[in-house]
Amino acid sequence: MSKVVVLNDKLEKAGELDLPSKYAEVNPHNLYLYVKSYLASLRANTAHTKGRSDVSGGGKKPWRQKGRGGARAGSTRTNVWVGGAVAFGPTNERNYFQKVNKKQKRLAFERALADKAAKGALFTADSLAIESGKTKDANAVIKKLGVKDVLIVKDLLDEKTLLAYRNLANCYVVDVAEVNAYLVSVFNAVIMEKSALESITKEG
């Protein structure tokens, strides 16, 4: 069974909690589909090329069909001509959206949590607030955890805590309402406030 490491006020190990066993039984393909969909949604369709119907000019046949000894040509704007159209190029009309059902999103999130817990990289603590709002204090928390990078999930994200963690490259703080399977997967460790973890497991 997947275990959540419980930390005390000093961020030292104080015990373990069990994740629901069904989390680890979720097909990992659900996680793959969600991550693929999430990354696709971040793509901006800014790349654009002109096709035959978009490029200007080329309406007149450049030379007669026969008698020159050279290849025939009907337009100076085909894709083989310099200044011509692009064949099969990207256009800004493309939609990268990939649909993932609500249930599938939930299953992907459960699997992501189970994977982190199986590696001993899912932690919980009563409070993760940085009341001073100072990056120095936030950095001390990361050092105590002893992880390369970490996702911090708050039950109610306050401005001071956000300011404290915002300038650190090796962590990302997010409200429990905004956390998703991709964020859980991409970080080496995840630490959640106890109330945030309870609300997540209660929903599942």
UniProtKB/Swiss-Prot annotation:
Q: List UniProt keywords, sorted A-Z.
A: Ribonucleoprotein, Ribosomal protein, RNA-binding, rRNA-binding
Recorded GO cellular component terms are: ribonucleoprotein complex; ribosome
Q: Name one GO biological process term.
A: translation
Specify whether rRNA-binding is a keyword of the entry: yes
**What start and end residues bound the annotated signal peptide?**
none
Segments of this protein annotated with the region Disordered: 49-75
Q: Supply one GO molecular-function term.
A: structural constituent of ribosome
| Annotated S-S bridges | none
Q: NCBIfam families in the record, alphabetically?
A: rplD_bact (TIGR03953)
Oligomeric and partner information:
Part of the 50S ribosomal subunit.
Matching entries from HAMAP family are given as: Ribosomal_uL4_B
Q: What does this protein do?
A: One of the primary rRNA binding proteins, this protein initially binds near the 5'-end of the 23S rRNA. It is important during the early stages of 50S assembly. It makes multiple contacts with different domains of the 23S rRNA in the assembled 50S subunit and ribosome.
Checking PANTHER family in the record gives: 50S RIBOSOMAL PROTEIN L4 (PTHR10746), LARGE RIBOSOMAL SUBUNIT PROTEIN UL4M (PTHR10746:SF6)
The text of the family note is:
Belongs to the universal ribosomal protein uL4 family.
Q: What is this protein called?
A: Large ribosomal subunit protein uL4
Q: Which organism is it from?
A: Campylobacter jejuni subsp. doylei (strain ATCC BAA-1458 / RM4099 / 269.97)
